[in-house]
A protein has these predicted regions:
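Hydrophobic alpha-helical interaction segments
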Residues: 39-144
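Short gly/ser-rich loop at a beta-strand->alpha-helix junction or flexible surface loop bordering the NTP-binding
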Residues: 1-58
């Protein structure tokens, strides 16, 4: 999926031209290596330090990550993409979204709940799967 899909729920717009490729744990290495054959800026499971120091999201890049089992996905034109619920949880958990933490997190949740129909049950189920249900529940409570 394209990182710019987060723009509509951001208060302080951060440019994100990254393409995120999520695949099962066993395939991450081979997907990463295959993409490196064709593209210049490909990163495998980057941590927050790598994101801040070396990855410029204003430029095109590809970030290869492990797809968490039981992730809420939907199909668009035959391609599985993350639901908004998945993105809301992942932005709080994943190091590559560290730049969205802090006050921006609350702004994102407020805008998401104002502008979209959020399936709270799906959101909380996935948050529990990612072991951050308490944090997500706090954001939900503060955003309403």
């Amino acid at each position: 999926y394209d990182g710019s899909i987060l723009s509509p729920i951001q208060h302080h717009l951060s440019i994100n031209h990254a393409i995120y490729v999520e695949t099962n744990r066993d395939a991450v290495e081979s997907v990463f290596n295959r993409l490196k054959e064709f593209y210049k800026n490909v990163y495998k499971r980057p941590n927050a330090t790598l994101m801040y120091d070396y990855i410029d999201l204003r430029e095109n890049c590809i970030i290869v990550k492990t797809l968490v089992t039981e992730s809420p996905l939907m199909e668009v034109d035959g391609i599985k993409v993350p639901t908004l619920e998945k993105l809301l949880v992942d932005t709080q958990k994943d190091a590559d979204f560290d730049y969205l933490h802090g006050s921006e997190s609350l702004n994102m949740y407020q805008l998401a709940f104002e502008q979209y129909s959020i399936n709270t049950q799906r959101l909380m189920r996935y948050a529990k799967r990612r072991s951050i249900s308490k944090e997500i529940q706090e954001l939900i409570n503060l955003s309403k």
